[in-house]
UniProtKB/Swiss-Prot annotation:
The chain crosses the membrane at residues 147-167, 223-243, 296-316, 321-341, 408-428, 436-456, 838-858, 882-902, 952-972, 981-999, 1072-1092, 1099-1119. One of its GO terms (molecular function) is ATP binding. One of its GO terms (biological process) is oligopeptide export from mitochondrion. ATP binds at residues 534-541, 1197-1204. The gene is MDR1. Pfam families: ABC_membrane, ABC_tran. Residues 157-464, 838-1125 form the ABC transmembrane type-1 domain. Residues 79-88 have a biased composition (Polar residues). This is ABC multidrug transporter MDR1.
Amino acid sequence: MSASPGLTAAAAGPDHLQARRDEKVIDSEKDALAHDAHAVNSGIPYPTATAPNVGAPTVPISVGRVSSAAEGKISRSSIAASSDTLRNSPLEKPISNAFSKSHPYKKSKFDFLKSRKKKEEEERKNKEKEKEASVLPPVSFFALFRFAAPLEIIAMVLGLVLAVAAGSCQPLMTLIFGRLTTSFTNYAVIANQISQGGLTPETSAALQAAKDDLKTQSGHNALYLMAIGIGMFLATWLYMFIWNVTGELNSKRIRERYLAAVLRQEIAYFDDLGAGEVATRIQTDCHLVQEGTSEKVALVFQYAGTFVCGFVLAFVRSPRLAGALVSILPVIMLCGGIMMTAMAKYGTAALDHIAKAGSLAEEVIGSIRTVQAFGKEKILGDKFADHIEQSKIVGRKGSIFEGFGLSIMFFVIYAAYALAFFYGGILVSNGQADSGIVINVFMSILIGSFSMAMLAPELAAVTKARGAAAKLFATIDRVPAIDSASEEGFKPDGLRGEISFENVKFHYPSRPSIPILKGFTTTFEAGKTFALVGASGSGKSTVVSLIERFYDPVSGVVKLDGRDIRSLNLNWLRQQIGLVSQEPTLFGTTVRGNVEHGLIGSRYENASLEEKFELVKKACVDANAHNFIMKLPQGYDTMVGERGMLLSGGQKQRVAIARAIVSDPRILLLDEATSALDTQSEGIVQDALDKASRGRTTITIAHRLSTIRDADRIYVMGGGEVLEQGSHNDLLANENGPYAQLVNNQKLAQEAAAEALQVDDDIEDPDDAVFIGGSSPMQEKDKQLHRAVTGRSLASIAMDDIQAKRAEEVAGEDKIPSSFGLYARLLRMNSADKFIYIIAFIAAICAGMVYPSLAILFGKALSDFEIQDPAELRHALSRSALWYFITALAAAFVIFFQSAGFSRAGWDLNGVLRKKLFTATLRHDIEWFDEERNSTGAVTSNLADQPQKVQGLFGPTLGTVVQSCATLIGGCIIGLCYGPLLALIGIACIPILVSGGYIRLKVVVLKDQRMKKLHAASAHLASEAAGAVKTVASLTREKDVRRIYSEALKAPMKLNFRTSIKSQCLFAASQGLTFCIIALVFYIGALWIIDAKYSTASFYTVLNSIVFASIQAGNVFTFVPDASKANSSAASIFRSIDNEPAINAESNEGKVLDHKHVVGHVRIEGVHFRYPTRPGVRVLRNLTIDVPAGTYVALVGPSGCGKSTTIQMLERFYDPLAGRVTLDGIDIKELNLASYRSQISLVSQEPTLYAGTIRFNILLGANKPIEEVTQDEIDAACKDANIYDFIVSLPDGFDTEVGGKGSQLSGGQKQRIAIARALIRNPKVLLLDEATSALDSQSEKVVQEALDKAAKGRTTIAIAHRLSSIQHSDRIYYFSEGRVAEHGTHQELLAKKGGYYELVQMQNLSRQ
């Protein structure tokens, strides 16, 4: 742009812009290229100075650091000398090389793609190796409870004792089995002897005595079984309740400590840790830890108690037989240890990949407007899917180990049965044992080993908890280099506020090869105001970060009042500083709450609510925020939304300023504090800041030089050093100096106004809009007619419809479809694994039939004990042992396929659900994301948590459920075949168990629904804090965040406590009733044996079948919590997937535009709009704007007047309540949305970049597939955005990682990359929402010229507070309260001397 003092009065269309630009574009580009190349690549300052007259030659200067004695005084001879030196130095080479033919980026498309793919493959392999090397080993079991209170430990120990007691009940049952077996065998022997010898009075009496004895023994043993059942009920109820409650408490403490640990870390830690990863860890990993430290631990001890008690009882009854069988234990332990170690290793690695995906998801969802504007949902979805694919691959490997481990374990267990009968037959034939002892030992081993089948999934949960806890505890135990939680450090009683830098050198830890500050030395005297100006990336914001001690210098010292700030208490230091950042962050609370955050750590922190409110109001008045706050629906108690999204940029900035000054800090740091304000607000707020600066040390970073010209000293920075310093007037005295050049670039002179154009004078009601091109008479007539009939506006009716629809959606969320429908759909969704599921289902059914098969073998073996001949007895039992061995082989085979198959399918389903849910989330319209329940934290939390819960049921757990059902059905069938009447009695009791389990399912489902919402809300708090960690740190809000988060966790804990009493009672009842059913079958069976209705073999076959069936009926409902969580999570996922947004970018409907035929004529006709989340606030009021094709139109006005909303309407983020938006005369609602948005490029006020390379971020703007974009196209876009030379100066060039949210780049660098991203798609319509707000003056000038050039041949609509950037627009619209108050060219509006004229007056730098 011209540096002339005045502005031309002619309308400045694109042709004029181009003609004006052609004069200086070559020199300007050279200036910028030289500036970036030397400031970043070489580190030597290379500012440019251009004389005021147009076309003057560019003169490079090298000033270096200037002493305070020579402030602003630089001789022209030194400039010339340094100029000659630089021209002849090798430092010119990077610039010339950037355009040489041999430049590495000047390759053919084929070579470029080939080399890029090769490099990406190498990087991927290296990252995989690094990931494998960085996988943390699982923590020990006891470490999971490191945060438990002593009373909780006592309760847990009591619970474990009760769990072991409950586990011993089943082995005790085998003791009764053994005694009854002895009685049955003796009775059978007597009955056989009598039948062979004939019935005599003596034998008849003996037979009757045997019957009476058997009947008595059966009655007593049935009572014993019922007593065991009651004991089982009480013990199970108590231990399940204790461990459920303590598990929730333990999880709560881990969540609290993890968040506390995250918030205490130094800022450099967050270069690799995104807020999404924090949310994922808190939801997924903490959920896994909770699963593995609650009732599942008690179940492991119960099943282990059953196992141990069974073996101990076996040793007591027959040491020889038990000793032979105990040989299986080492094999079981070895297999189990290997399996669990492998599962923990691969499980931890898989969770790391999922956490990375969660971090990406948080970035993407937090910038959903940018994603949808560029239509890159698929590309970012694919990147998310890549992380998930890696987790699937790792999870599949773990599945193989799990399958092998379990198959070998069960083979050993079942093979032990064969050993038991083979060796037992020898002992009985030798008279060393009787049948009762053998059966007692056999049943003890059988029940004990049977418990191992149930222990596996519970133990797997504990193993996963150990793996998940590794990463959590690593963060909790990490001692940061800069610890905000430390109480160490000196706390001075008083503070003057003098800040000094002594030879400070600094580079960011993630980019050690790029120096930021190079021996920076200066002193900021107490009570004075200082300003830092200079190019983007010159180190200005780094100075602020070092003062706040976000980082420590690599060398050198930063001092406060002569004391090294590293020796000061960190919280005390930050509490003395008020900071307003370039991109202000507000928290999801009220306006009042946000401002009160500034009182933390001050003397007002514990003041009364009334006193605090008065301080808040005073600060808001000083920050020019009070008036707009009072216009909000609830005033100071209005919720600002996530990250303050319900406020405009300027409104957020003013609230942030109020927050910074409310505590009256001694030091004030303003990093572009007024960058987002309109000129009118800026002037008022700047006056307030000037007033607030009096008596305190103030350091201001500014690109708008109008805000710092009254500073006591101004520092011009470049290349990490001070180029010159002095007061505003002193620096201007050096006409060729860097500061003078910056000022010249920002001059906005006033010329004599021509005859003022009349603004429409026929406005009677200020709330009625009078705009260019208003509604047609017919439209007005229709509106009046409709209002006459309804008494309400079209906008009000439309808003009512929206509100009703939202209420209906919320009400529908509590409805959960049938489980069968959900499960069927989940299986269909994972259809790629249908053969795996089929094989795994068949294998699980076969594994479930093993136990009924054992019942048949058991009955046959028991009848063999009635054989009196020892040799024949050994032969018969050997044959039974052989059948057991064959069954063991078959069981091992099917268990491998069951376990490995379901585990793999579970990981695959997890991946499918995560990808589909993420894709569906990105498809939602912006209105959906505006709702509080769909905040970034909540959505990211659901994305991390819900698929994990579905996998919890559809992994190995589903195999166990299928196996249990097969055992239940198979046992009933076997029982009916061998003894229908007795089996029917037992089967008739099973529905009692089932109904109890069903009631429990309902109770737990309702609990899980409510728990999900409560945990999602708390996860949002954690994600919000992690996403704004610099703001949290600067406000010393760490304790406050922890307190709020802890309060949020109390609600789910209380809910869990109440519901656990009911649900665990029902589970315990199902366990206790099993023994009562067995007692009933036992007693009735004994009576029927006495009556000769059943043989001993038939009785035991039926009994064991029913025993196994009833046990499995009870065990099926062990998985009720898993099923409940899976149900509610699956329902929620499907609701999201099935949701059809009103504005759907994936829809194929609508007219598809041909890019070649799109002209770019944009028109807004009579638009009314209110945000659905704030229906009481009118944002746009009958707005009508016409933008002819190829014109450059600017929108200006106060913050909150509707400018950004207009841009959002053009992007079709929302649909108007009334009126319409058209492109080339076609209502955009009739156009295909993806096709329409492909014609538009958006550059937002706060640029959004994603974790990845610079190349990746620029390519996100391309309309065509990424692989089809040539390097020449990328280069051209970057050159137009004045970022090319900076990129090629980096060690990795376009492949440089930008960090999460672009954290590795300065604000100006991010903005220029965002502009390159917008230009690479060659749009027909260019939307610029404060596109140059984050740029320094030099960069702004060149980028603005690039944007002017880019505007050639396309429609451009720009929002700007810096009027210097839009003064040559074809038309300028001045907004006020959602309507156009003035319109015209720059000179026409100046002539009107209205609102626009006042803005120009405020920005005029020519009046010194």
